[in-house]
Amino acid sequence: YASENLSEAEIQKIINRLNLIPSTPLYNGNRETFLLVNEGFDMVRDNISQVALHVDYIDFDEPSNNIFKVVNQYSVQGDHLRRPDLLVFINGIPIAICEFKTAIEEDTTIHDAWEQITIRYTRDIPKLMKYCFLSVISDGANTKLGSIFTPYKFYYSWNKANDQDKVSNGISSLLTMVEGAFAKDRITKVLRDFVFYPDDSKKDEAIVCRYPQFFAAQKMLDNIKEHMRPTGDGKGGTYFGATGCGKTYTMLFLSRLIALRDNEAFNNPTIVILEDREDLDTQTSELFVTAKKYLHENDVRSIENREDMEQTLRDKPSGGVYITTIQKFCEMTGLLSDRSNIICISDEAHRTQTGVGAKLKKTDKGVFTTFGFAKYLRDSFPNATYCGFTGTPIDETIAVFGKVVDSYTMKESSDDGITVRIAYEPRLARVIVSDEQAKEIQKYYDQCIAEGSNPEQVEESKRAMSSMTTILGHPERIKKLASDVVMHYEALCAEKPEIVQKAMIVCADRLLAFKVLKAIEAIRPDWSVARKSEDESTLTKDQLDKLVTLPKINLVATQGQNDE
């Protein structure tokens, strides 16, 4: 801003606008600071004859115009003197904090680095932490990225510097993080579009993208622009992401890029998010309606019914982000808009969203031509561009939405610790009846016959004794099963102590489930004690207040209408 001839008072006004944001409560201060740094503000000049000046703290368009500094052991005086291992500054603003531990020392772990940032530093030096939007923890062999509010289990490695690179691991992961997330042109992109604070968060959430989300959103944006109508074919492309890898957040990041990053191409677009189940519609809506500030769009909501959809979308001139189910589109819907700056993003694009062609349906009354929901959707928005997100890319998906633009496989997701690999491992808990026990059983039945019991009744009882439920519920088998489950679970937890391991035991009926529960509780009585954490002493009062008290193991069962 050298050409603006700012006065000393105006420079101080710009600095104070940041400094005077309260640091307590820390989450509110951090979010407000981030929004100010991200969006800038309009400053009224001291000379009222001059036009108000829009001030940006970071030049996101030209990263080279910014001043980047990395400072180690920076001393900060708060309630206590603290020295974070590393701070990353952009134009004097400490936007990232890094804490390092060594993998050699057994008494310190990467989890200790997380605790140091999220507990000690947030408690003792909040005036610094309100500026720290990114948080990095490392033990040399593992390096992970999150925010200062991110739970430890949601810190993840940035395993690729560039999308086509091989996945890094071990010591190289730190260098990959630096190159992939903290290069000048990368860190500015991450801060600008890939950090999300919900408008109204009751859980102090600050979402930082993972590397597959960062690459996927940008590649999908480029492909959508290339295939947009009227010059393109309207096939915005397919994103193949493993189940549980965060596709909904990828859709949110993509929506921001569409809404804000190329006005010449999109010209205030309308974005329609399409689900195929009500529960997914609700889940997606709950996220998107808290992202109005992030999307720079006040009209973000779920479409309630067909009437609401027609009133909202018919001849809408521009803008808006809407979440709806594809089943709301039918033959009667007809044309809603022929604009070309409508972007339809289909979730679970392999299921109900590929039926654009005619099918013959034979009934008792004759043969009829039917169409899928996707055909009616395209009748409603004939010039829209369509892109699909799926965990199961089938040929029809690619034919309708276009080529797979980017993918993140289950193996990659599992290797990165984002999803848990499901593997079948047969473990037999056999129940063997000894010869002596068999003789005792036969002796009992012989006695029953001698005393006048009906032979048919005896045979029926034998069949009942050998039925599956009886075998499964044999006390010895239940005991062996419980012991094997506990041993197996604890062994897996010991292999990867940094990951929260979960287990589900499926039983034939509720009675068997109850017996298994009691058998496991007999082996590990402490598992039935309700707690908020394995070690509550490591958490602050505020953190404990946000957690629900639960036992480590519990019984979950359904109940039918005829059950007592």
Positions of PLM-derived features:
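Structural recognition of the conserved hydrophobic beta-strand(s) that form the central parallel beta-sheet
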Residues: 137-138, 322-324, 344-345, 385-390
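Interdomain helical connector at the RecA1-RecA2 junction of SF1/SF2 helicase-like NTPases
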Residues: 168, 398-500, 516-522, 529-532
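ATP-dependent helicase/translocase motor core
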Residues: 1-270, 275, 279-295, 317-321, ...
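Conserved helicase ATPase motor motifs in RecA-like P-loop NTPase domains
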Residues: 242-243, 350, 370-397
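Conserved motor-coupling elements within RecA-like helicase/translocase cores
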Residues: 304-322, 335-339, 548, 560-564
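Conserved helicase motor "Helicase C" RecA-like lobe of SF1/SF2 P-loop NTPases
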Residues: 510-557
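Conserved helicase motor
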Residues: 74, 278, 300-310, 325-331, ...
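Conserved RecA-like ASCE ATPase "motif II neighborhood" in helicase/translocase motors
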Residues: 318-376
